[in-house]
């Protein structure tokens, strides 16, 4: 890293073209075992220049300003430490839309889109109220509102910092009808909901984590006791009071945890309906 820092100090003193910077940055990212090295270097420079990636491809001989080089290399240094790219550029795509993110929230994952897929498959026309528990950046609540505009969506999170990010995203996407409420799971609920969405922390703290990027994400949003199932189990119990009869519960968890979640859910009149990747859906049985 000392050799790299010396190289960067030298490079900022000399004019550098787009192509030259991208090649050098991608090489450094490869040495740091970042598989998407070329893509990441392009996204970082696109962010600094406020230009789309295709502009970089067409203007490879353009010379970077000194301040642009300095900013790009500062971001590159952080990426070499495996800080998530989304935190560096301040946004991440989810379900075809761009969302603001910060270190206060998890970086949206592609597998979480499976929850939206199950929601759209399973929701019934009479089901009109949705709550997203542990909303984080608001991706599930906002996407649900955009895909199901006939529904009323509430979003709960214990973190005021996360709620601030979620509200920014709601404003960005014009979904100001979503209600954002600070709450520990469903503690603040005032009504029964037809649908409960919950991407809660489910990582067992004892698991070996190969992904160094998660070290930069909030532990509060990743880890849970009881082999990762503590918060999910608490929510299952809360559905007795706050999930409407015949209501729909959609969770995310590691597939290795699904069988235990399904077994625990039966104690709360929840019947497993369907799983898709990391997502699993339950229906609440009607009382006799």
Where are these predicted regions, by residue range?
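Mobile active-site "lid"/loop adjacent to the S-adenosyl-L-methionine
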Residues: 200-231
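Conserved SAM/SAH cofactor-binding pocket of Class I
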Residues: 110-207
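Short amphipathic alpha-helical segments
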Residues: 167-168, 208-212, 236, 262-264
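Conserved Class I SAM-dependent methyltransferase catalytic core
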Residues: 100, 227-284
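Non-catalytic accessory regions of SAM-dependent methyltransferases
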Residues: 1-49, 54, 64
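Conserved AdoMet
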Residues: 46-121
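Flexible, glycine-/basic-rich loop-and-beta segments that form/coincide
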Residues: 286-288
